[in-house]
Amino acid sequence: MCIDGICSNVNFKKYKLNIMTIAVDFDGTCVTHDFPKVGKNIGAEIVLKKLADKGHKIILYTMRSHPSEKTENAEVSGMTSTTNDCLQDAIDWFAKYGIPLYGVNDNPSQHSWTDSPKVYANMYIDDAALGIPLVYEDMKHIYDSSMIRPYVGWVRVSEMLYESGVLTYNDLMDIIEEFNKRY
């Protein structure tokens, strides 16, 4: 199957769940990499808002944390966020775009059936996940000469969500239209 010149031989099965729990990373996934600051928007807010409006439960699943002794050590090395609370900065980003969070590094419903620390979700969206579409262009954040940090390509992710039955065709067209207006 090809969409806009992007071809895939993956045969996506249709999800039969009415409401999905979706765990989403933050840096490189919702925004560009600029830790400990919040990076630039890359379209995640459009897709995640659409998913939340359809009733899907969004869990922020990130390495960001509230201040602690470890993060105080990071301050000494010049790694500070705007509010000195990297996790709260990410939570505030979701609130700014009207995206309700079902959980933060936690799935509240799983505690009744497991003690596992891994957050349970039906789907994980993370720039480090195998197969996630990434954008390598316009990279301004070069940490060293051999490492460029790509970020998630949200138009392609929305197409994958459509292909798998999570979004409707109209949802996809709304997302692409909004993406074209903003970016």
Regions found by a protein language model. Name each.
Residues 2-183:
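HAD-like aspartate-dependent phosphatase fold
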